[in-house]
């Protein structure tokens, strides 16, 4: 299926509505808190220079970003426990230098009810404040938003992590290792300057063993490239 035809199936087609999702507003937003795990797989060589606030390995960047909410509460009545979000993104040059913007698309967990769907779009759209309000400033174009079955898995010992939307996105990685890596230990970076989930984090590095995208007008396949897993803990507004 072509990207053009596929866009006909997304929930929100009008680009102005997609962009409106990422316009900052925190009026009448309830208190919220979510925590869980995030990872990406990307086009860059290992380790991805973007995590160190540098330009991508090959000049441009293509990636899958996946979030799993272990614990989440939006307002007094809406639990977000166990829900997933998946993003696709591309850009050219250093995203942290302020001279480029991300072209993106987002999928939200189809098992979310109406209240949960609204909360997810508020939080991940940056309209509910918190870290994602800052992250949203990096986005220049939204190609589409949709709800889909998102499978997210991460090993307890961080030996592997993966996310999948059947027929659209596959992102699987294994923990980076080498001859000097002690058994069971992980290769980590403390306080990465280009962290995608906020300051003060710990990134665990991995190698993408499967990275394939054909959705929302994005199409690529990059195996054997960079990946990283980072826990997140956000509050708002």
Q: What function would you assign to each model-found segment?
A:
Residues 7:
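Cationic, low-complexity basic patches in intrinsically disordered or flexible, solvent-exposed regions
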Residues 27-74:
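N-terminal ordered "arm"
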Residues 69-137:
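Structured domain cores in non-transmembrane regions
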Residues 108-181:
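Charged linear interaction tracts used for macromolecular binding and regulation
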Residues 176-237:
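Extended, charged low-complexity segments
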């Amino acid at each position: 299926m072509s990207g053009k035809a596929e866009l006909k199936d997304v929930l929100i087609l009008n680009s102005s509505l997609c962009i409106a999702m990422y316009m900052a507003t925190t009026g009448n937003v309830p208190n919220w808190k979510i925590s869980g795990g995030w990872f990406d797989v990307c086009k860059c060589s290992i380790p991805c220079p973007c995590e160190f606030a540098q330009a991508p390995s090959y000049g441009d960047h293509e990636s899958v970003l996946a979030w799993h909410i272990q614990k989440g509460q939006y307002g007094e009545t809406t639990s977000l426990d166990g829900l997933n979000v998946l993003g696709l993104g591309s850009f050219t040059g250093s995203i942290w230098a302020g001279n480029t913007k991300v072209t993106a698309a987002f999928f939200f967990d189809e098992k979310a009810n109406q209240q949960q769907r609204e909360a997810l779009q508020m939080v991940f759209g940056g309209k509910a404040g918190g870290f994602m309000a800052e992250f949203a400033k990096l986005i220049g174009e939204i190609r589409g938003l949709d709800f889909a079955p998102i499978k997210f898995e991460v090993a307890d010992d961080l030996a592997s992590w993966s996310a999948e939307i059947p027929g659209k996105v596959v992102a699987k990685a294994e923990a980076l290792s080498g001859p000097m890596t002690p058994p069971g230990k992980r290769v980590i970076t403390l306080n990465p300057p280009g962290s995608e989930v906020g300051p003060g984090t710990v990134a665990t590095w991995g190698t993408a063993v499967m990275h394939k995208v054909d959705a929302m007008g994005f199409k690529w396949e990059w195996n054997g490239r960079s990946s990283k897993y980072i826990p997140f803990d956000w509050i708002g507004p």
